[in-house]
């Protein structure tokens, strides 16, 4: 925040020549590597850039960073969906039982179960939500790992 508030006052770090002494030394050391044959000669190999990818690396990288996580997500979201489905059915059956008992007390004829549709609606909503999450993830990342 100080750098943003007082950007003009940073000139005092410069020496007389106007260069950043410590920064120049750091940049020169970072660009020099001891295994280069001649530091000051232009690199001729830059024109012949090898863009081939090691097959083993490509497969293992794709597996570790995409396919295995997708498999884990599918298994996890399937389990979440099944647990949610069981919970929704339990709650719906309790709601139906309470509604049924209340309707039988208030009138002579008992009303039919109507919350079964609501239960199915809740299940499909959970399924749609999980499908959208998985679908967006796969659609965004699959082209990168196929190409």
Swiss-Prot record:
Gene Ontology molecular-function annotations: G protein-coupled receptor activity
Assigned GO CC terms: presynaptic membrane
Alphabetical keyword list: Cell membrane, G-protein coupled receptor, Glycoprotein, Membrane, Receptor, Transducer, Transmembrane, Transmembrane helix
Tree of life domain: Eukaryota
Glycosylation sites: 54
Transmembrane segments: 1-12, 56-78, 129-147
Pfam families, sorted: 7tm_1
Localization: Cell membrane
Membrane topology: Multi-pass membrane protein
Topology feature Extracellular, residues: 13-55
Homology family: Belongs to the G-protein coupled receptor 1 family.
Role description: Dopamine receptor whose activity is mediated by G proteins which activate adenylyl cyclase.
The protein's name in its UniProt record: D(1B) dopamine receptor
Organism: Macaca mulatta (Rhesus macaque)
């Amino acid at each position: 925040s100080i750098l943003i508030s007082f950007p003009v006052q940073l000139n005092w770090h410069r020496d007389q020549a106007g260069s950043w002494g410590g920064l120049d030394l750091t940049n020169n050391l970072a660009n020099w590597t001891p295994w280069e044959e001649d530091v000051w000669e232009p690199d001729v190999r830059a024109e012949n850039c090898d863009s081939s990818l090691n097959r083993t690396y490509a497969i293992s990288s794709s597996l570790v960073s995409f396919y295995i996580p997708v498999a884990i997500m599918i298994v996890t979201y399937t389990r979440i969906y099944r647990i949610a489905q069981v919970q929704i059915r339990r709650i719906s059956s309790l709601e139906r039982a309470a509604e049924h008992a209340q309707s039988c007390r208030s009138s002579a004829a008992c009303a039919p179960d109507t919350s079964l549709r609501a239960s199915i609606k809740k299940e499909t909503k959970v399924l749609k939500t999980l499908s959208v999450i998985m679908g967006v993830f796969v659609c965004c990342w699959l082209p990168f790992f196929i190409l």
